[in-house]
Curated annotation (Swiss-Prot):
Domain of life: Bacteria
Free-text activity regulation comment from the record: Feedback inhibited by histidine.
Pathway: Amino-acid biosynthesis; L-histidine biosynthesis; L-histidine from 5-phospho-alpha-D-ribose 1-diphosphate: step 1/9
Cofactor(s), by name: Mg(2+)
GO cellular-component term (any): cytoplasm
Entry-linked Pfam families: HisG, HisG_C
Biological role stated in the UniProt entry: Catalyzes the condensation of ATP and 5-phosphoribose 1-diphosphate to form N'-(5'-phosphoribosyl)-ATP (PR-ATP). Has a crucial role in the pathway because the rate of histidine biosynthesis seems to be controlled primarily by regulation of HisG enzymatic activity.
Enzyme class, UniProt record, top EC level: transferase
Locations listed in the record: Cytoplasm
Protein name (Swiss-Prot/TrEMBL): ATP phosphoribosyltransferase
EC number: 2.4.2.17
Gene assigned in the entry: hisG
GO molecular function ontology, one term from the record: ATP binding
Record-linked InterPro entries: ATP-PRT_HisG_long, ATP_PRibTrfase_cat, ATP_PRibTrfase_HisG, HisG_C, N-reg_PII-like_a/b, N-reg_PII/ATP_PRibTrfase_C
Length: 289
C-alpha cells in the first residue's frame, strides 16, 4: 500500500512540515524537487499549491492532502473531509477572508459596493457572497499583492488575514467577514473506501491532531511530601487533574500534570513555596485524547 499525500507548497509548507515532525514524521524537502522525502515507506509526498490540492485529490491523482477549507469551497471539490487541523502559517488558529476597503472611503457595508470592482484570489466564493447579499459588482482575479490595489485598481478586496496587520499597513479597513477557514486533511472518495489507505489516514489524523493538542503545552512533574500535597494541588489550575503516584518512600508522592506553557513561569515558584521538590518541566510533542 502506498498513500500519495499532498503537502501544501507556499505559505503553509513550513508549518505543515513542522506539524508532521511533531507528529513523528520526518519530511525532507529540496528546492529542486516537488517530491519531498518522508521516513515512512507507506507514504509518498508531493508538494502542491493549496489552491489546487482539492482538485487533485478529487480526481484521484492524490489519495489525500492538506489544504484550506477556503480552497475546497472555492473549487466545490467532492472530497472526504478527514480532519480539521487548526493551524496556519503564523499562528495556530483559523484565518479569515475579509471584505476590506480603503480607510478613507465612504464604504461602510457590502451594499455600498454596488457596481464597484472587487479584487481577490477567491473569485467564485466572492461571487457567491455578493449574490447572497444581492449586490452586483465586478469581481476580478488578483494574482497577488491584492492589498495595494485599492483605490486605484479596485474599490475593495477580499483577502485572507490572520492578524489584520497587512491590511492596516495598507490603510484598509474590514467591513465584513466572507469566510472563516482552517487547514483540513482531505481524502479522495475511492481512497477513503480502501481499508488499508483509510487505516493509514486515520493513523495520520490521530498523530497530527495529537501534535496540535500539544502545542503551547508542557508537562510538569514534581515530588511532594504527603503533608504538603493539598497546598501543592491548590497551586495548580482548578480544572487540571494531575496524576498522583506513591514513591518508594510512602511519605512522598509524585505529581505529574500538563499545563499551558505561558503559565508555568508563574506556577513553578508557587509550587516550590508550597513544598514541591525536584520540579521538572518537559516539552510535549503529542497529546492523544
Amino acid at each position: 500500500m502506498l498513500l500519495k499525500l499532498g503537502i501544501p507548497k507556499g505559505s503553509l509548507e513550513n508549518a505543515t512540515i513542522d506539524l508532521f515532525r511533531r507528529a513523528g514524521f520526518q519530511i525532507t524537502t529540496s528546492s529542486r524537487s516537488y517530491f519531498p522525502g518522508i521516513d515512512d515507506p507507506e507514504i509518498e509526498c508531493m508538494l502542491i499549491r493549496a489552491q489546487e490540492m482539492a482538485r487533485y485529490v478529487e480526481d484521484g491523482i492524490l489519495d489525500s492532502g492538506l489544504t484550506g477549507r477556503d480552497w475546497i469551497e472555492e473549487n466545490e471539490a467532492a472530497i472526504v473531509p478527514v480532519a480539521d487541523l487548526i493551524y496556519a502559517k503564523q499562528s495556530f488558529g483559523k484565518v479569515r477572508w475579509v471584505l476590506a476597503v480603503p480607510e478613507a472611503s465612504s464604504f461602510r457595508t457590502v451594499h455600498d459596493l454596488e457596481g464597484k470592482i472587487i479584487a481577490t484570489e477567491l473569485v467564485a466564493t466572492t461571487k457567491r457572497y455578493m449574490a447572497k447579499h444581492g449586490v452586483k459588482a465586478k469581481v476580478e482575479f488578483s494574482w497577488g499583492a491584492t492589498e495595494v490595489k485599492p483605490p486605484v485598481l479596485a474599490d475593495a478586496i477580499v483577502e485572507v488575514t490572520e492578524t489584520g496587520s497587512s491590511l492596516r499597513a495598507n490603510k484598509l479597513k474590514i467591513i465584513d467577514t466572507v469566510l472563516e477557514s482552517n487547514t483540513q486533511l482531505i481524502a479522495n472518495k475511492a481512497s477513503w473506501e480502501d481499508p488499508e489507505k483509510r487505516r493509514k489516514l486515520e493513523d495520520i489524523r490521530m498523530l497530527l491532531q495529537g501534535a496540535i493538542n500539544a502545542l503551547g503545552k508542557v508537562g510538569l512533574m514534581l515530588n511532594v511530601h504527603k503533608d504538603n500535597l493539598k497546598a501543592v494541588l491548590g497551586v495548580l489550575p482548578a480544572l487540571k487533574r494531575p496524576t498522583i503516584s506513591h514513591l518508594s518512600d510512602d511519605e512522598w508522592l509524585a505529581v505529574n500534570t500538563i499545563l499551558d506553557e505561558s503559565t508555568v513561569r508563574d506556577i513553578i515558584p508557587r509550587l516550590k513555596q508550597a513544598g514541591g521538590e525536584g520540579i521538572v518541566e518537559y516539552p510535549l510533542n503529542k497529546i492523544v485524547l
